[in-house]
């Protein structure tokens, strides 16, 4: 999937080299397309210098268009909120948007940052409350918003140079909280949040993943309120979850996708004694 700044196209290039044009905009594209898959449906989003964020299907049908009032240089980033997918993106007039897959605004959005937004948004649950935050660097300020549009505590964070990348969010030092790593015009910046958080299942870096695919797939979960440590999905983290984890470790029992994710507290791909120690620590504290 590509966008062009000469012919103003969103195009699909097949593996045999043939190309299909999905949309012709009224001005050039300067950002990469982002793709979300839900069920069998694909939506491709790309912002143009015709002042619109365009969303089209894989067959070229216009899904929706958001008139931003200025050029769109940032690529869309996706988040799943209670089964509904939202796209976050900015425009050159300083507006940060959050829209559903019909183009409707998320409650509390857009937010007026006031300066041109060229970078894309990353997501993480910074404080471990089960609700993600949206993080974006604009000029020399790093912003973090709750999903209702309110600002996260201690943000924005100021820096002497302009931020030039989407945040990469990870627990770099394996201490249970998250670090925000952001490129700037003068250096690489790391900000320690110092609250227990999670990036699991979130678009937590530029273009979604290490391969920079810009692809997001909505995966149905058997648990309506997924939470690391809540292995039996009863909204509590307690001794019953420990027993299930120990049974899995000792007996090498099969787990569902959700149980495997919820049991792997340190997200190292292995369910072991370290995860048990982590859940005991959570319960005690």
Predicted regions and their residues:
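Extracytoplasmic/lumenal domain signature
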Residues: 1-222
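Cellulosome-associated attachment modules in secreted, modular CAZymes
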Residues: 220-285
């Amino acid at each position: 999937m590509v966008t062009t700044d000469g012919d103003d196209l969103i195009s699909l290039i097949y593996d045999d080299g043939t190309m299909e044009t999905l949309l012709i905009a009224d001005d050039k594209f300067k950002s990469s397309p982002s793709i979300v898959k839900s069920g069998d449906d694909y939506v491709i989003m790309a912002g143009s210098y015709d002042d619109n964020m365009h969303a089209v299907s894989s067959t070229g049908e216009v899904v929706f268009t958001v008139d931003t009032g200025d050029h769109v240089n940032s690529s869309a980033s996706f988040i799943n909120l209670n089964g509904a997918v939202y796209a976050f993106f900015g425009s050159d007039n300083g507006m940060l948007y959050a829209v559903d897959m019909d183009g409707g605004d998320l409650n509390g959005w857009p937010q007026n940052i006031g300066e041109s937004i060229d970078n894309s948004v990353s997501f993480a649950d910074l404080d471990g409350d089960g609700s993600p935050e949206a993080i974006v660097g604009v000029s020399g300020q790093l912003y973090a918003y709750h999903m209702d549009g309110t600002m996260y505590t201690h943000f924005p964070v100021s820096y002497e140079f302009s931020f030039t990348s989407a945040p990469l969010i990870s627990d770099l030092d394996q201490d249970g909280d998250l670090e925000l790593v952001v490129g700037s015009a003068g250096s690489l910046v790391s900000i320690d949040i110092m609250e227990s958080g999670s990036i699991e299942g979130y678009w937590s870096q530029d273009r979604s993943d290490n391969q920079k695919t810009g692809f997001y797939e909505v995966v149905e979960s058997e648990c309506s309120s997924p939470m690391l440590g809540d292995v039996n999905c009863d909204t509590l983290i307690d001794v019953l979850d420990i027993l299930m984890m120990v049974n899995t470790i000792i007996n090498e029992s099969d787990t569902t996708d959700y149980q495997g994710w919820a049991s792997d507290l340190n997200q190292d791909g292995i369910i072991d004694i370290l995860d048990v120690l982590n859940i005991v620590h959570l319960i005690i504290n």
